[in-house]
């Protein structure tokens, strides 16, 4: 079906775990005719949750792509995970999407992962609309949820719909644009609905919220301001145009509501996607850089007449077709059996097949164009974040940032036959998942696997067994500690070796200084006048990059510091990049105990929903874990939300303790917050353990 690019909508469905993302997506696929039955998550039958682990656990683990059509518009959808351990899937999806639907649990409102994905969408300037889901559940409160969107996310919610009833009395919605009530017929699984007059007891509230809608929308357009001033109202088409404009500019976020599981509100959500979210030609201009000159900016126009440019945002292994590379096309066209340039690696890649995906189902296509999201078969060198383009139009698009792992496990093959298979399996899994890291412990020879959480690594081990038939012994999870420095020091260091054969000489003067948390490692050269030839300076940086991974105190990577190369000296014959690399390492070792080294540990933001009667016990347990309560919120319905900061080291196995404290009635979620200094008594314990 040929669709104009102005009628494309590339969207993601994002939310906290269990807010109902996948259920909402399944209803969208049913009502758009993409599938002829409703797949339920709790039955393990959701088409978008196709992995065995997803079916068994009832959660989304990997982002799944699909395409459907609504009101002559093509909607490319990516359903993303809600569990914090798989936040990389959200990150790379939002990087290539034009808009998003943020789904909220009508009872819990804004939850920790809701905040995380919201900030990720902010980072990429992704316009979004909100869907307050589960309005049929006990304790659902639409107005509290809207308030939380404002206070916890710092957003400007613009209410477009109001619920008619709540909990078991939830019947439908009031559309504030048309000022009509929409009532769904339950016997048709929500496929049929009717427009009716607004119930008289809700008319005043509807008018109140419509006035707020008109006030905000009219400011988006000069014509609308004049019309609103003259008539105190706006025609429906002009009102929609204004809401769309404000949404795309990020002035506000439209808020809709419903119950996906009860089949209410999904069609009007689809209308909202079409009416308010941008097409590829409505978003900010895409700017790339010249691979040979990073200062030279190149503008990309979203037109199929332009040269081909795309971003690879995901690589995965398919047991039937091999490696699949998912791309978003930003300009031009692409044909199967053609060749493209990987601009970052300056390598030509041949495309075997081109596929349109529906979760794990594949449809071969011969051509794709600007705005399309497709999977390519046959690429050998391309990884997540690489730019693909026409060979005569080299360009680099902005890469994605991936979070550092916070937890690690030691892993070793059970048998010698598993040894080689383990390496192959891990290399493929690491290639798929940029938040998964692998290294080898130099002393023990053990393979160390690092990830975003216990569940993340548990799934990886399970996939190794199922997909690669590898059996492995796995150690207990360990915290991925870090180290940093707290003082600035300058080090003069000379590396000299002249005992027979070719000599080595390099002299460096390096200033080491602490950085604010989150800044990682920075290197700067202030060499002027040729004190060190420029071809030797990368050797200094490389030496520091390598040695910082071993840390100072207990062998953990050193982070959040800057090294500035101030001065140095060289020898015409005996100097080399290697000599300067060794000099940098020597300077680092000399700096180690002079710069006030400290150990850092990952601190988690923990959110617990508990019945009020267990609140004291829950808070007491948090305090015993070196945690601190930072906020409490009354959910109503005898429930409280406790927000706390707790070291990850003290959160292993927490779910079992929480169940015991609350007789199984409390639940929690957590995500990485920051690194903080470890108390000295804990450092002493860690030294005994790791040194």
UniProtKB/Swiss-Prot annotation:
Keywords: Cytoplasm, Elongation factor, GTP-binding, Nucleotide-binding, Protein biosynthesis. Residues 6-281 form the tr-type G domain. It is found in: Cytoplasm. The keyword Protein biosynthesis applies. One of its GO terms (molecular function) is translation elongation factor activity. GTP binds at residues 15-22, 79-83, 133-136. SMART domains: EFG_C (SM00838), EFG_IV (SM00889). GO terms for biological process: ribosome disassembly. CDD domains: EF-G, EFG_III, EFG_mtEFG1_IV, EFG_mtEFG_C, EFG_mtEFG_II. GO terms for cellular component: cytoplasm. It comes from the Bacteria. InterPro entries: EFG_II, EFG_III, EFG_III/V, EFG_IV, EFG_V, EFG_V-like, EFTu-like_2, G_TR_CS. Catalyzes the GTP-dependent ribosomal translocation step during translation elongation. During this step, the ribosome changes from the pre-translocational (PRE) to the post-translocational (POST) state as the newly formed A-site-bound peptidyl-tRNA and P-site-bound deacylated tRNA move to the P and E sites, respectively. Catalyzes the coordinated movement of the two tRNA molecules, the mRNA and conformational changes in the ribosome. Belongs to the TRAFAC class translation factor GTPase superfamily. Classic translation factor GTPase family. EF-G/EF-2 subfamily. PANTHER family: RIBOSOME-RELEASING FACTOR 2, MITOCHONDRIAL, TRANSLATION ELONGATION FACTOR G-RELATED. This is Elongation factor G. It comes from Wolbachia pipientis subsp. Culex pipiens (strain wPip). The gene is fusA.
